Amino acid sequence: MAVSRAFQRPATPFGPGHRGVDLLGSPAGPVLAAAAGTVSFAGPVAGRGVVTIGHGAVRTTYEPLQPAVTAGAVVRAGDLLGWLSAGHPGCPTTTCLHWGLLRGVEYLDPLDSFRRITPRLLALRRG
């Protein structure tokens, strides 16, 4: 996974920024769910395919893609959401996936979910 454009938190709720990360991809490549949840939206927004998944207190968005899921579908981490489409503005190559993460109305960096993973050692059982 290569990041084409990083998250840039807006200084104000409607100010400029980049409310997600852009990940380089291949045309028609599979787009998979990052975590389990329920699809709350799958369809076009401003001419591009979008899928939104609710995960309890947060929701993730994926665009542009040709959705393979419909609203109400329950997905697990790794399930197919659709196929990557061209047409994301600002992408330096043919196709990029814009991946967003929201908690309420606050945009978060979706990559922080991976950066915060702390290794844990488990006790060795002798028996």
Where do the PLM segments sit?
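Short glycine/threonine/proline-enriched tight-turn/helix- or strand-capping micro-motif at secondary-structure
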Residues: 2-33
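Acidic, glycine-rich catalytic/binding loops that coordinate metals and/or anionic ligands
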Residues: 2, 24, 70-77, 95-127
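Zn2+-dependent peptidoglycan hydrolase active-site motif and core
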Residues: 34-68, 98
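Short hydrophobic beta/alpha edge segments that flank linear recognition/processing sites
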Residues: 50-53, 75-92, 97-98
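Short, well-structured beta-strand-loop connectors
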Residues: 30-39, 69-86
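Solvent-exposed coil/turn segments that connect beta secondary-structure elements
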Residues: 8, 28, 44, 56-58, ...
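Conserved beta-strand positions that form and line the central face of beta-propeller blades
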Residues: 22, 52, 61, 83, ...
